[in-house]
Amino acid sequence: TSVYNAIIEAVALGNTKLNDIHQKTQIEKSKLSVYLKNLLELGILCKEFSVDANIKEQANVQRGLYKVTDNFFRFWYAFVFPNISELEAGDAEGIYKYVVERELERYTSYVFEDVCQQYLRRQNRLHLLPFYFTKIGRWWNKTDEIDIMAVNYQKTDIILGECKYKQSVVDVKDLKHLQAKQSLNNKN
């Protein structure tokens, strides 16, 4: 239905918190929670928590970020669905140039984060990392985010990573920025 399409579109466009989805769709929060629950059960959306979130935090409906699980679905609802009239009218070139091309690097960066996590999971299974991690995901607090954090069971060893899908080369400045984020994580 149009309600579900609006919710999926909102999430695909980067509105990943419950309140952001509510603001974008203007759906009453109590009803929105039911729709989101249905989309989670169908596997269309998933809910992501900071890698350091405990079970109590994960049980809180207000916590976590929603994400479209399938990259094709995510692309469709981010670029095709909101522009379907123009595309049906034959303006694929204009939509690509003025909509898709402008957002493609940002969109692809989220997909690249998933690819990087998959790569680390594979390396972990093959025991090719300095330690075996038991948990991997993104870490965030109210002001900062780390794209990848992997920790061992004892939480004594950690891998941090920033996933940059961009034209420019990663440099020392990027490394120092990640090191500063590591110190933020150590405070929590």
Give residue ranges: language-model regions.
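A cross-kingdom feature that marks ATP-driven nucleic-acid transaction machinery
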Residues: 60-188
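Interdomain hinge/linker elements that couple catalytic modules in large macromolecular machines
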Residues: 1-73
